[in-house]
Amino acid sequence: MLTSSTSIGLLTWAVSRHGYHWVVTTPRERTEEIERQVLSPRASLASATKGREREEPHDDLRTVYQRDRDRIVHAKAFRRLKHKTQVFLSPEGDHYRVRLTHTLDVSQIARTAARALRLNEDLAEAIALGHDLGHTPFGHLGEQALTPFLGRPFRPSEQSLRVVDYLENEGAGLNLTWEVRDGIVNHPWSMPPPSTLEAQIVRFADRIAYLNHDVDDALRAGVLSEAELPAGPMKVLGATHSERVNTLVTDLVAASEDQPEVQLTKPVFAALDGLRDFMFEQVYLREDTEGEHERATRLIRELFQYFLDHPKEMPEEYHRAPGDLPTRVADYISGMTDRYALRTYERLFLPRGWLHDQG
């Protein structure tokens, strides 16, 4: 092995019209060559990336998508996902999903499908790990509470892009590749389809993950019973969490093989849609959670108004970010974890211990 202060490489044989000769290749170059030889013609090759907003020297060890993945994992916003609610605002016990465990579920499903389809697993993983970085505290209630202040819908996917572009790394952003950024901002089903098949996989993996683990959490919380689960979708998808995920991932791989887009077969997609409709009716929009939802919404709105009136009390990085004051306040509020938002509200508005006394 040849090493220097700036590069790492191996001597390998190369063939040209002049015969065999030695060349130095880096681990990254060998990975890129393996991608060219092994991956599907429809895969996104790291060596063919559209690049970054700011050009950077190549890394000897990692491809561009591997570097993006690592940057996301080391981001502060990624670490905060462990204290952000997925669905249940006040879960009792340690087994309920939060944004971080959801993100890891999505990543695992996306990697499995990408590998099976000979697509770029590193790209799929990076998009999956970054897709929820912009989510608010208290789940979707947080984004609904922010919308009236902004004069436009607060979209977590757009906020995730803002996080990686402007808010991380002391305002310099993570400078991710075009493909990862496209996959992050276009992962919701309300957006145009992402440009890469890897990002389309993440879009499906997100829905597969959240519907199935939300069913699992609802059963654990006593919100649903096994007997209440919809018979039609359960018959198609399976009776258990693992059966349902296996059915969906296996179907996605079979239906997407050598196709120009990622898809499910019609019966399985219909069953997934049926399960989603059921979850919205029975779990996500349940009337008996309205009091809890109202408290979370009020907390977000009062915090927003406070920092709108006292912007100097926000950390310095939120003053450097581009955008008007409401946008920068939304940056700060949406970046809070559930417990940090509660502590901040308590510190600003309530006698010590009041929130805890309320149960």
PLM feature spans:
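Histidine-centered, transition-metal-coordinating active-site segments
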Residues: 16-103, 107-113, 120-121, 142, ...
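Intrinsic disorder/low-complexity segments in short proteins, especially the signal peptide
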Residues: 7, 15-16
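Short active-site segment of divalent metal-dependent hydrolases/proteases
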Residues: 134-135, 209
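Intrinsic low-complexity, disordered N-terminal segments enriched in polar/charged/small residues
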Residues: 1-6, 10
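A glycine- and small-aliphatic-rich helix-loop capping segment at beta-alpha/alpha-beta transitions
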Residues: 139-150
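Short alpha-helix carrying the canonical HExxH Zn2+-binding catalytic motif
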Residues: 125-130
